[in-house]
């Protein structure tokens, strides 16, 4: 009852005033419930278009998840394929564009389902998705929130008490030295040159930990805090190196096939 009680008046007001509604949740089950509610509201002729965004990784049709045009056929000529098939127009005729619908279109037309859902969202009246798409500085929807003015939006935060912990995690990245050293050893023991390049990368990354440790040794009085400034330029350079290595690794994985259900390098990259 609370979902439709929040959505119905918001959608009605948005349609009357040319606004877009974002309904964000912390749980997939709540997103599914909201999408189901919208499907009932957005019957043919109601004049409402809605899209349910699934996580990018879960939407991927490849065995190995790495978004780069050089290794993903679903990203290659994406715009051309969408335009030639007039997919956006087709999808906007539906009351609700679900992840399953986008996946089906992606398979049939060899295009990225996630990008398709984002393009549909540009024209939709209601968007349902995770907190990430609004609040995560690393994955928020820049096409909607790049500007500082949000006068054209209505934001509904489902179970907002969950947002505190999520927000804290968004702005508190974690890097474990034990994990870095574990990957260093694993890569160094592989015979392939590419893995040795990864080992060199992890060796350099491991060298940053003493710098971070030394910067936290300043005595702090109870009730006060001390800022810790990581070597941002060094991390930025390593990030560029990792991007290059991951492209090569994605090509390698396409050639050799999946190694396991949970790839350690892939998990590290997206952590």
Language model features by range: what are they?
Residues 9-10, 33-41, 52, 137, ...:
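Alpha-helical scaffold elements adjacent to nucleotide-binding pockets in ATP/GTP-utilizing enzyme cores
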Residues 160-161, 165-232, 236:
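Conserved phosphoryl-transfer catalytic core
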